[in-house]
A protein has these predicted regions:
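Short, solvent-exposed beta-strand-terminating loops
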Residues: 22-35, 95-108, 156-158
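Short, flexible, glycine-rich and Lys/Arg-enriched loop motifs at helix boundaries
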Residues: 38-40, 108-114, 170-183
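A short helix-loop-beta-strand connector motif used in the catalytic cores of GNAT acetyltransferases and
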Residues: 47-50, 55-83, 101-106, 131
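Conserved acyl-donor/pantetheine-binding loop and adjacent beta-alpha core of acyl/acetyltransferases
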Residues: 73-77, 86, 90-134, 142, ...
Length: 209
């Protein structure tokens, strides 16, 4: 297994969508459908996406189509950042990582109850905190170190880009098999420590420089 990690760029939009269409939730995950775009969307944009779902016919199918269209456009516009893991040219894993200033919210949340847009706490400017908000690995590749490879790449690139910290937001109430923000132990192994808590969200940081 020769895994390659690539930073998401607009020309990888097709691979990104293909991953979420066919492999990310092939085990019947309760998070399907998802295209990992809501972190980068304001509540107004999310409401617009709900209206678009109605135009697509409503119901689960309309919602999936609306999510998909929105995510594809956001990748092409460079609004979603992160890393795809590939095995023989097929995307099998994803990590959503971006400048903290580019997220409207972090931590676990349900799209049926989206938290209000909030200015980032503990982050005053760009290039200070690289945030890691989500992991998704194809079921047959879980437990093989793919998330660790993705996390290591995020931290290495963040250091090279001049960030002071990498920051993650695992939950203390979600079983590890469903923890799309990543389990605590993943971050502990990579040198992250608890920085603060916001409700059930554990804010974990790693000092990069």
């Amino acid at each position: 297994m020769a895994i390659e990690i690539e930073a998401l760029e607009p020309d990888l939009a097709e691979a990104y969508i293909d991953f979420f269409d066919h492999r990310a939730f092939s085990d019947g995950s309760p998070y399907y459908p998802c295209y990992c775009n809501a972190y980068n969307m304001s509540t107004v944009e999310i409401e617009q996406m709900r209206e678009a779902a109605k135009r697509f016919g409503g119901g689960a199918e309309g919602w999936q189509k609306s999510l998909r269209e929105s995510a594809a456009q956001m990748v092409k516009e460079g609004r979603i950042h992160g890393y795809l893991a590939f095995d023989k040219g097929i995307a099998i894993g994803w990590c959503n990582a971006n400048d903290r200033m580019n997220y409207y919210r972090v931590g676990e949340f349900d799209l049926d109850h989206v938290p209000e847009d909030r200015a980032p706490s503990g982050c005053r400017h760009e290039k200070q905190i690289k945030s890691i908000v989500c992991f998704e690995i194809s079921p047959e590749y879980r437990g093989k170190g793919i998330a660790t490879m993705l996390l290591d790449r995020v931290c290495a690139d963040a250091l090279a880009e001049g960030y002071a910290y990498a920051e993650a937001y695992p939950s203390d109430q979600v079983q590890s098999s469903l923890a799309f923000t990543g389990p605590v132990r993943l971050y502990e192994k990579a040198g992250f420590t608890e920085f603060s808590r916001i409700g059930s969200t554990i804010v974990m940081r790693k000092k990069l420089r």
